[in-house]
UniProtKB/Swiss-Prot annotation:
It comes from Archaeoglobus fulgidus (strain ATCC 49558 / DSM 4304 / JCM 9628 / NBRC 100126 / VC-16). PANTHER family: ENGB-TYPE G DOMAIN-CONTAINING PROTEIN, MSS1/TRME-RELATED GTP-BINDING PROTEIN. Residues 2-186 form the EngB-type G domain. Pfam families: MMR_HSR1. This is Probable GTP-binding protein EngB. GTP binds at residues 10-17, 35-39, 52-55, 132-135, 166-168. Its cofactor is Mg(2+). GO terms for biological process: cell division. InterPro entries: G_ENGB_dom, GTP-bd, GTP-bd_ribosome_bio_YsxC, P-loop_NTPase. The gene is engB. Keywords: Cell cycle, Cell division, GTP-binding, Magnesium, Metal-binding, Nucleotide-binding, Septation. Disulfide bonds: none annotated.
Length: 197
């Protein structure tokens, strides 16, 4: 059987590595500061590689050139490996997503998270959106606005197969874990489903 891949992508400092660790019950390497990790963290279970990609987007203290290089690397990685990627998990910070997205839209730009969501939907067969840091927001209001900004008509509950409210730091990831596992089982990737303990 050919190797398949599940990728985790998201802006710097959204809790991507923390979510990765919460789902798979082990610690992954993290940069000393957000945005400093340039290499993907990967591990393989059976025929599936699980990859935590570097965080993208502007990071205070780094040049825009550096941020663009990281984003370009992430996009190139996804395009290069698109044939083997069976699912992608985009992690957003639910507590700051709306503010950041609205700021970028006021400047006439497509927010990076929205651009990435659209890109992942174009190149990967299944996208899971992990709305992290839910302990810091009003669930319903924020999730409805997040869904709408990503092109999904509220209420967000209609999109439970896409949007997963999580709090990775507290280990509150059960719905995402369950559905990722079920999705892999539906693809006959039983060996990889063992990754979710």
């Amino acid at each position: 059987m050919k190797v398949k891949e599940v990728i985790f992508a998201g802006r710097s400092n959204v809790g991507k590595s923390t979510l990765f660790s919460a789902l798979f019950k082990f610690e992954v390497r993290k940069g000393k500061k957000p945005g400093t990790t340039i290499r993907p963290n990967s591990f393989q279970v059976g025929s599936v590689i699980f990859t935590d990609l570097p965080g993208f987007g502007y990071v205070s203290g780094y040049s825009r050139n550096f941020s663009e290089r990281v984003k370009d690397f992430v996009v190139e990685y996804i395009e290069t490996n698109a044939r083997r990627i069976v699912a992608s998990v985009e992690v957003i910070d639910a507590s700051s997503f709306l503010e950041i997205a609205e700021r970028w839209e006021k400047r006439g730009y497509i927010p990076v998270e929205i651009e990435m969501f659209e890109f992942l939907n174009d190149v990967t067969p299944r996208v899971f959106l992990a709305a992290n840091k839910m302990d810091k927001v009003d669930d319903i209001t924020n999730l409805n606005k997040i869904a709408e900004m990503l092109g999904m008509q509220p209420p967000w509950e209609k999109w439970r197969h896409v949007i997963y409210p999580v709090c990775a730091k507290k280990g509150e990831v059960s719905a995402l874990k369950r559905d990722l596992k079920q999705y892999l089982l539906s693809l006959n990737l039983r060996d990889a489903a063992k990754a979710f303990r």
